[in-house]
């Protein structure tokens, strides 16, 4: 993974030398806020300047590159916002770099714009899918960790001691696999949900709140990907459950398995 991380850093830096970056954070819940926060941290750490995307602004198809925030928004049949945004704006930019994502469907978008896209996948199922659309590894499709792993974790910590036993943080939305009610549940990812994350201060404060909540617990039970990632980064015991499609297990297999031994994936019975 170190080599892939290096390629991720270097590729963005190589484009940055001769192009202006225009960043559009992925809309969504507080997990998408974590992705945005980590992206801002990544930009700062690598001295990558950018401007936020704004409706009505004029962009150059010669010099501007759209950086589309990663995540799980490009899932045909579940979410359309990311697809529609890219479809409506791709002609304004020299390239569109899709930050680490899980992608399902929307084949026409990717086939018809193969010369415009550089796609970073965050797990192998998406990587294999994008390759099947004639994208070439190390040219216009890459694989790396979810952006949350690029978070500058220390600046979000409260360092409060652990004094609570376990937190249940299960989905209460359409990505829940079972829809079952969980006792004493805290779906903290839904504290915010919308197109908010171009505001880096809001993104970071939301992320800080999620981390500060999780810091107090010894065990975290969740089917929320970014709750599982944050809890793993914090060294918690994590029981990680499937969502309604392959995303959770695929990211677990690529980025969490064998790296965070206190995180276990609980397969559906």
Where are these predicted regions, by residue range?
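Active-site anion-handling motifs in enzyme catalytic cores
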Residues: 1-269
